[in-house]
Amino acid sequence: MGPSSPTSPRRSAKPRPPPGNAMPTPVVAPSLLAADHGDFAAGIRTIEEAGLGWVHLDIMDGHFVPNISFGPQVVAALRPRTRLHFDVHLMLSHPERFVAAFAQAGAERLTVHVEADHDVAKTLAAIKDAGLRAGIAMNPDTDPRRLLPYLDSVDLALCMTVFPGFGGQAFIPTVLDSIRFLAAERTRRGGDFRLEVDGGVNAETGLLCRAAGADTLVAGTAFYKAPDRRAFVAGLTA
């Protein structure tokens, strides 16, 4: 992907409004990265059939993380097929270059990394100016205090519970301390941003994240491989 912003078709289906921040149960957002890459539309249908309202879209550039996934053209192609809330996670070196493209493609939320090579405050402002919800993400070895300057201006804080780049990795339990820190900070500030976790989330680790304060769980491999996906989701949201 280059720095230019491609022209994407306008969405033809009105997206479902995202759930509010004050929810009695957590949100499960399956990662499309774990679906069949030859049939993303089927992966979307699987999420809908499980009764869920969000899909997590991992965007990787091969620079910020050692893998490449897909870009705004794929997001735009999926947008008319579903009303799912598009939770787009930009694992890009220069995410500010792609805000307009993903907004036009149909994203409702863009999350960028605090470690990426960009002016974080300006990028978050650009996301909001585009009419989207803004999120800030951190890697497992990042000090959660780096997120403090941005928590009052985001709708979501994302703790990576694996090192980003590939699905199917093992959960890193030390990140639970970062989740607890951010949850306590949210309470201290009286904030309402969502606290999301991504990586190695399954029936066991998802409950650990919930207990630590997370309310938005990105599940990939565990969701798509579950023999009963509705039961899997119910186990995380009970």
How does the language model describe each region?
Residues 2-22:
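NAD(P)-dependent Rossmann-like dehydrogenase/reductase catalytic/cofactor-binding core
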Residues 36-39, 81, 97-101, 105-194:
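Conserved anion-binding
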Residues 49-54, 107, 154, 214:
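A structural motif
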Residues 40, 47, 58, 102, ...:
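Conserved, mostly hydrophobic/aromatic
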Residues 55-72, 162-170:
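Glycine-rich, proline-tolerant flexible connector loops at the mouths of alpha/beta enzymes
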Residues 127, 210, 224-238:
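C-terminal helical cap(s) of enzyme catalytic domains, especially alpha/beta-barrels
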Residues 31-35, 60-62, 91-95, 115-117, ...:
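Active-site beta-loop-alpha junctions enriched in small/polar residues
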Residues 26-32, 55-57, 78, 86-90, ...:
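Hydrophobic faces of well-ordered beta-strands that scaffold small-molecule active sites
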